[in-house]
């Protein structure tokens, strides 16, 4: 693995940078009412109709038009409450209209849909184009942070950093973030998580050999080491030892200053889950073991996107109380969301991983080997697995919304669903990183 410690010295501790070029507007408060409708109405309200043209086949002639109006069919009481609570003490719980247009001057022309083709047969929900003004601002700030504050990458990796399109990614996944500063909380953490994955596990010198020690020491940047006066300074100095640890340390510092203690602790535990999944995958790579399909899926429940959607309340400027987060039915919703959206990554990165050195485990590869299927049939079965997980996530979210229709629960469920949808859209549109196999 390359020695990233030569990329620069650690920056001084800095507080959150206030927005300078983009005025942030609080999320609007929209009227709501009590819950009386069925769970199916929850699903309808989660996913307003959005048309995203498929660029693959030549489209039939159609009149030029802007994006269709964002509407929600039906007039159920639950649909209205999903738009946000009102009354004393509920301002922070009021989400922005999930896919509604934000007030402000209209652009001279609508931005065309981003290139990219969805996996045929994949159950998903189209989303509108992320706000281009926010995308540009988040992209500018995160690059400044990566280069100036944490010296994240050498010059030759700049193209890969830009191709990651993390600004578009995070704006699309957090449509209810009240300000760009809130979006930056998620963006820094996402970049730091990917730096650890790339530099410790995969693309940029990663190796399963010694992975446990590297991950444990990096984790202390998130979950601090508490020791004696003699040894603490050495640990503090170690946080600047390489780019992944510098990124974790800085990103977590910003997050802790914005989050509540319980939100910060939630994130620490979710990152421990992620690192445990990295270790399982690394152990299999080291021994050449191909797990059973269920074993692979169990590993992916830990090595997955879970830490990203579960900070939706912090990024949204509110808190899902710890007791509500700990409910078994909420934990099931979160697990299913993470599992479904991680299989999306397996499907879109399939071709990229086949063309990379070494053998990469993903769901189609494991199904092909363990169930003796050809590559195409294994890939199509993986699509079916994703679809069942996605439907299960939505059904579990609907059941929870009906069982516990508290405003923070409903908003959190909306946020997780928005993250799942935005994550798929980023994979679909990121043609720099992903392309589909020729199975259709």
From Swiss-Prot:
Required co-factors: Mg(2+)
UniProt catalytic activity: (E)-2-methylgeranyl diphosphate + H2O = 2-methylisoborneol + diphosphate
InterPro entries assigned: Isoprenoid_synthase_dom_sf, MIB_synthase, Terpene_cyclase-like_2
Transmembrane segments: none
Superkingdom assignment: Bacteria
Other remarks in the entry: 2-MIB is a volatile organic compound that has an unusually low odor threshold. Together with geosmin, methylisoborneol is responsible for the characteristic smell of moist soil as well as unpleasant taste and odor episodes associated with public water supplies and contamination of various foodstuffs, including fish, wine, and beer.
Role according to the record: Catalyzes the cyclization of 2-methylgeranyl diphosphate (2-MeGPP) to 2-methylisoborneol (2-MIB), which likely involves the intermediacy of 2-methyllinalyl diphosphate. Is also able to catalyze the cyclization of geranyl diphosphate (GPP), albeit with much lower efficiency, leading to the formation of a complex mixture of cyclic monoterpenes, consisting of alpha-pinene (6%), beta-pinene (23%), limonene (32%), gamma-terpinene (29%), and delta-terpinene (10%).
Entry's family note: Belongs to the terpene synthase family. 2-methylisoborneol synthase subfamily.
Residue ranges of the region described as Disordered: 1-33, 46-74
Biased composition (Pro residues): 9-29, 50-63
Keywords per UniProt: Lyase, Magnesium, Metal-binding
Protein's recorded name: 2-methylisoborneol synthase
GO molecular function, one term: terpene synthase activity
EC numbers, comma separated: 4.2.3.118
Binding annotation for Mg(2+): 197-198, 202, 345, 349, 353
GO biological process, one term: terpene metabolic process
């Amino acid at each position: 693995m390359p020695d990233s410690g030569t990329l620069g010295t650690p920056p001084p501790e800095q507080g959150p940078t206030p927005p300078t070029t983009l005025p942030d507007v609080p999320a609007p408060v929209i009227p709501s009412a009590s819950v009386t409708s069925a769970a199916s109405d929850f699903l309808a309200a989660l996913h307003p109709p959005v048309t995203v043209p498929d660029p693959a086949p030549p489209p039939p002639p159609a009149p030029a038009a802007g994006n269709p109006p964002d509407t929600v069919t039906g007039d159920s009481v639950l649909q209205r409450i999903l738009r946000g609570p009102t009354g004393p003490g509920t301002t922070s719980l009021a989400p922005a209209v999930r896919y509604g247009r934000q007030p402000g001057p209209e652009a001279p022309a609508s931005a065309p849909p981003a290139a990219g083709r969805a996996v045929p047969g994949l159950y998903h929900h189209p989303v509108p184009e992320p706000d281009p003004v926010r995308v540009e601002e988040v992209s500018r700030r995160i690059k400044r942070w990566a280069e100036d504050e944490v010296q994240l990458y050498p010059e030759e990796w700049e193209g890969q950093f830009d191709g990651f399109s993390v600004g578009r990614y995070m704006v699309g996944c957090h449509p209810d973030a009240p300000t760009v500063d809130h979006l930056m909380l998620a963006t820094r953490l996402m970049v730091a998580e990917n730096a650890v994955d790339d530099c410790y596990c995969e693309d940029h010198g990663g190796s399963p050999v010694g992975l446990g020690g590297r991950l444990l020491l990096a984790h202390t940047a998130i979950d601090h080491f508490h020791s004696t006066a003699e040894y603490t300074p050495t640990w503090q100095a170690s946080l600047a030892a390489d780019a992944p640890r510098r990124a974790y340390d800085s990103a977590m510092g910003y997050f802790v200053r914005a989050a509540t203690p319980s939100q910060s602790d939630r994130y620490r535990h979710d990152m421990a889950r992620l690192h445990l999944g990295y270790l399982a995958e690394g152990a299999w790579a080291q021994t050449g073991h191909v797990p059973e399909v269920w074993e692979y899926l169990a590993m992916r429940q830990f090595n997955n996107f879970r830490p990203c959607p579960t900070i939706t309340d912090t990024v949204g400027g509110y808190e899902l109380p710890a007791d509500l987060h700990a409910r078994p039915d909420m934990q099931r919703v979160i697990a299913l969301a993470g599992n479904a959206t991680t299989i999306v990554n397996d499907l879109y990165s399939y071709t990229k991983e086949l063309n990379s050195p070494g053998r990469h485990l993903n769901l189609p590869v494991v199904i092909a080997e363990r169930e003796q299927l050809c590559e195409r049939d294994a890939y199509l079965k993986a699509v079916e697995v994703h679809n069942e997980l996605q439907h299960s996530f939505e059904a579990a979210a609907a059941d929870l919304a009906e069982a516990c229709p508290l405003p923070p629960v409903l908003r959190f469920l909306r946020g997780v669903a928005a993250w799942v949808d935005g994550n798929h859209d980023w994979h679909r549109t990121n043609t720099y990183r992903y392309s589909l196999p020729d199975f259709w």
